[in-house]
Every structure is written in C-alpha cells, then in structure tokens.
Amino acid sequence: MARPLQSGGGKEVAGSKGVIKKVEFVRIIAKALYSLGYIKTGALLEEESGIPLHSSVVNVFMRQILEGNWDESIVTLHNIGLTDEKTIKSVSFLILEQKFLDLLDEEKVMDALKTLRTEITPLGADSSRVRELSSYFVSPSYCSSVRSPKQDTLRARSRSKLLEELQKLLPPTVMIPEGRLEHLVEQALVLQRDACMFHNSLDKEMSLYADHQCGRDQIPSQALQILQAHRDEVWFLKFSHNGRYLASSSNDQSAIIWEVLETGVSLKHKLSGHQKPLSSVSWSPDDHQLLTCGTEEVIRRWDVSSGECLHIYEKTGLGMVSCGWSPDGKWIFSGLNDKSICMWELDGKELECWKGQRTLKISDLEITGDGKQIISICREASILLLDREAKVERFIEEDQPITSFSLSRDNRFLLVNLANQEIRLWNIEDDLKLVSKYRGHKRTRFIIRSCFGGLDEAFIASGSEDSLVYLWHRGTGELIETLPGHSGAVNCVSWNPANPHMLASASDDRTIRIWGLNNLSTSMKQKEPHSNGIHYSNGGT
C-alpha cells in the first residue's frame, strides 16, 4: 500500500520543460512496470513515491471485478466519482452482461432472466446486444458450448478481459489505460521518424538511447552498376512487385528482363519481336508475366521464366499506346491511338471498350488495386479517373500539359509530371486534392517520368533532361539529392518496392544505372565489365 501523497512535498513536475506532471509520470511508470510483470518493483515504486497507481476505491472496484462480485462492483462504481451518466451506463452494462453469462454457466436460468429483465434492459443501452442475450434462453447450444472442466480458468480469463474493456470506458484519471507509457514512447519515435529527412530504414533499427536522425547514407546515391545491353535510348523501366526483376524498354524495339540478385543485376531475357520502339512495360500482379507495348503498335505478353511470347494483342487499323493488368491478373487493359481504352481476356478476346476522349496517343495507364478505377491522360491537361463499375468519371484538371503520371502503391495518390518542369502530388482517395509540388528537374522536350519510392514511399524520384536523377522528400517537398552519372537525358526512374535502398534510372545514353547505398558498393565497384553488357561502376561514366 502506498503512503498518502504529501501535498507540497518535492517538485510537482518532472523534466526540463516543466510540462510533465510528476504524479501522472510516476503512475504511468508504475502501470508499465506492472504490465511488464515487475510486480514487486511496481509496488515498491508506489510505496517509495507515496503515489498510488489507483485510488483505494478503484482498487476495491478492480478486485470486485476479478472476484466476480458483480452487485458490489455496481455499488462501488457509483462511488468512484464519475459524472458522465453515459459512461456509468456503459460500464454497468458490461458488468451486468458478465453477471448474466456467469449465471447461465451455473445453470441459474431464472436468476439470469431476472438480471436481464430488471437490471440490463432498464439501462437502455445496446438494444441489439440485449436481444442477442435473450436468444441464449432458446439456444441451449450456448450453455453446453461454454461448459468445460476448465470453467474456473475460463471465468478468470473472461474477468480479466472484462477489466480491460472497462478500462477503455473509464476516464484515464480513474484508471490508467493499458500500454500508456509504450504509446507515448512510440508516439515520440514516430514523430522523430517523420521529421527525419533521410529516414529510409526499418523502424526496428530505431533506438531509445538517442534522438533519431538518419544521414544521407540511407539514400541510394551511389551508382553500383551500369547496364549496357540496349542498343539505343532506354525509355522506360519498372521493377517487379516482388523486387526480384527489372524490366526495361527501348527505342531499339526490344525489352529486357533483368534479374536482381544479391551479387548484382544480371540480364535474364532479351525480348524481341516488336517492329517499333517500346513505350512501356507492365508486370502481372504475380510477376510471372510481362506486357510490352510498342509505340502505336501491338502489345505482347511474355512468360518471365522462359522469355517466351505467350500472346500478341492487336486491333485492325489501330495501334496500342499503353498497357496494364487487372489486379487479379485475369484481364489486361490497353489504350489505343483512337483515344479509346479496351479490356481484354488473356486469350485476346475483347471484353469491353470505352470509346471517346479516354486517352492520348502517348499515355500512361493505371488500374487501382481494387480493379474499379482506370486512370489515363484523356486530354492534354486532364487525367481521367474512370470508375468502370459505377460508370462515374472524375477528372484532375491541370493548368499545364501533362506528360506522365505514377500511382502510389496504396492507390491513394497520383504523381503527375507537367510540361512546366513541375511534379504535382494529388490525393485521389475521395475528393481530388492537390497535396504537394516538386520542382528543380529539367524538362523542355521529352517525356520525363517520376516515381514514389523508399520506405513507405517517403521519397519522390524523377528523371531529368540535364542527365541527373532528382530525389525529393515526399512530405516536405524539399530536394534532398541529385545523382550525376548519365550522359544523356534521364527518361524514367523506378524504385525497388522490396528494397528501399535500390533505385534504377534509364537514359538516352543507352544505359540503365542501378543506384544503392555507398556502403554497399565496395564489393561491386572493383569488378570488370561482364560479357553480357553489365558494367560495374563507382559512379563515374
């Protein structure tokens, strides 16, 4: 039993800022000690500080709950000092509900019925639950299902669970919430993490011993490899969902599937057969197949394991301009140069076609994870969000021509590249809302693509016509890094979704650069160029 708290004795606050009330602080620490199983230490803290964890009446109330003294606990509840009648009713309801269930367990059916009629129902709380309790009288399976040789143990557990539920209803000044100290510490860590400009590592690496602050070494800024297998400008690239592969497409009319290994990125398959430059690629949801789209030509579907072309999608007199998968992998979508969007079965059967001003000749195409929305650039400065089930169309209207866009992994945000050298972040979840803008990269003539990336997609990366890769902090919009190395315009970037420390960039200089952390490059940068067109680099050209 703790000694009574001495009024005016000692400091009433803790910490250098004078904002932590000592009594609350000690009580929260004691609560944490008890929760961690340090019962003697918690009791000793109460005794030495003279600050009890709970008042004597609350301790009596808790003991009555754990011992199943339901009628006494209701009386004590009214002596705790609660003023909110709604809280009193809610707490009383849970206590009497447990009393009712205990009586049924003991086969005291008439007593249970009396409790339901004269004590629970008059509270006027949770009528649907009252009806459910009433059904137990006509459903003998309930009683038989709860009886067991371990009935006393089960009751003790249910009473502990009840106490936890009551704790959520009672004011924190009466009964300190479970895990309150842990919640405050986690809250502080999350705030430090969110304020860290370069945070790009798992939270388990955060420490309580010092304020959290990552350095630039958490950002992929070192060119670990230069991939040189394409014979012309590399226009597009994309990591697979599992991060094990990278696909690239080029003006040389080919696509390449690269395999991401611990030792580096290596060429797996070179995909040939298109008669025009390839504008984009799209991974199937399971990463077993890949779509490649020729510029106003056809779409080809490939087996990733074998490199075999499984199907060619084409429409007489029309050319494809974009491609994408349904979330279940059963259909594909394509934009056509007559500005329509079509949906196909894998065998090539056309299922549906949305005609009219749905897409442009050079266009991105995305399908949200629930399969409901198709997103495309429908006019020079407009993006269409088409709900194909509800037949509802929404539009993002920009004041500049749109060159490309990228959908976030959680399908809530859209990154839009504009002709005026600006990237805009839109929230598309409910009402369309402009969230942030990113500036600094160069674009005057070409299609430059950007992407989300890093841990929790906390960063934005973009190509640029000045041969640099640009990196911004997503939340603040601050430019945090520019990566030199390419000798031509950087057309596209892709961040590995399974590795926040790996970034790829595609350039007019016919190369792909794999960027990683400085401390990872040591084992790779000294290697000689491979015969398959892969060159290892320490960042130079």
Descriptions of predicted regions:
Residues H212-Q222, I257-K276, E296-M320, P327-D328, ...:
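Per-blade loop-tip surfaces of WD-repeat and WD-like beta-propellers in eukaryotic adaptors/scaffolds
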Residues S249-D252, C293-E296, G335-D338, I377-E380, ...:
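Conserved strand-to-loop turn within each blade of WD40 beta-propeller repeats
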Residues D232-K238, K276-S282, L318-G324, T359-I367, ...:
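Canonical WD40 repeat/beta-propeller blade segments in eukaryotic WD-repeat proteins
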Residues L237-G243, S282-D287, G324-G329, E366-G371, ...:
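Loop/turn segments within WD40 beta-propeller blades
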Residues Q228-L246, S250-N251:
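Beta-strand-rich domains and repeat architectures in extracellular enzymes and scaffolds
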Residues R216-D217, S436-F459:
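A surface-exposed beta-alpha-beta supersecondary segment
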Residues M1-S221, K527, N532, N538:
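Eukaryotic adaptor/scaffold assembly regions
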